[in-house]
């Protein structure tokens, strides 16, 4: 397991016990264990509202560009085109721990480099951790606009703690590897 006291993305100090940067939401601790990957990929129903994670989900090269400075970090992003093809006909809400000052450039880059059209997006406005931040946006924006019927939603989310938060609301939340093939490195 690798621990950081300095965030590799924003270079802010974090205590050794933090799993995610308090400033930008970057994952700080990576387990060396292999994640369980479904052999038979799941379908994504077209009637679902997709609650989409940005880093480590839509972005395919988050780890290699984690040290890049803005705006280069945005310009160097590559996307999971197999995932994009599976969700491009859904209503997609991007909810990310990325800082709000990156929103306009990030959305422009996604639009210019994929067939995905983000219907709504919600960003980190401070030092919020991903699960707390995404729960905030879920309760403040998503549920008031779209209702709180969990069967309407599917969250595609890299962060296990955030998937657990969605589960509190009975929203199915899965990592991208349940839907697409893992790239061989």
Model-assigned labels for residue ranges:
Residues 133-161, 166:
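Conserved Lys-Pro-Asp/Glu-containing loop-to-beta segment of HAD-superfamily phosphomonoesterases
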């Amino acid at each position: 397991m690798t621990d950081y006291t300095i965030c590799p993305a924003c270079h802010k100090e974090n205590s050794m016990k933090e799993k995610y940067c308090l400033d930008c939401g970057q994952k700080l601790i990576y387990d060396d264990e292999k994640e369980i990957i479904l052999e038979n990929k799941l379908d994504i129903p077209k009637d679902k509202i997709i609650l989409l994670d940005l880093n480590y989900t839509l972005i395919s090269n988050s780890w290699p560009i984690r040290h890049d400075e803005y705006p280069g970090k945005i310009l160097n992003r590559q996307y999971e085109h197999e995932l994009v093809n599976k969700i491009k006909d859904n209503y997609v809400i991007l909810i990310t721990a990325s800082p709000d000052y990156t929103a306009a450039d990030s959305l422009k880059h996604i639009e210019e480099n994929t067939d995905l059209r983000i219907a709504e997006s919600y960003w980190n406005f401070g030092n919020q951790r991903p699960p707390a931040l995404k729960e905030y946006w879920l309760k403040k924006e998503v549920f008031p606009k779209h209702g709180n019927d969990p069967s309407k939603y599917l969250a595609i989310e890299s962060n296990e703690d955030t998937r657990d938060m969605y589960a509190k609301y009975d929203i199915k939340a899965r990592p991208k590897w349940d839907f697409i093939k893992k790239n061989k490195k």
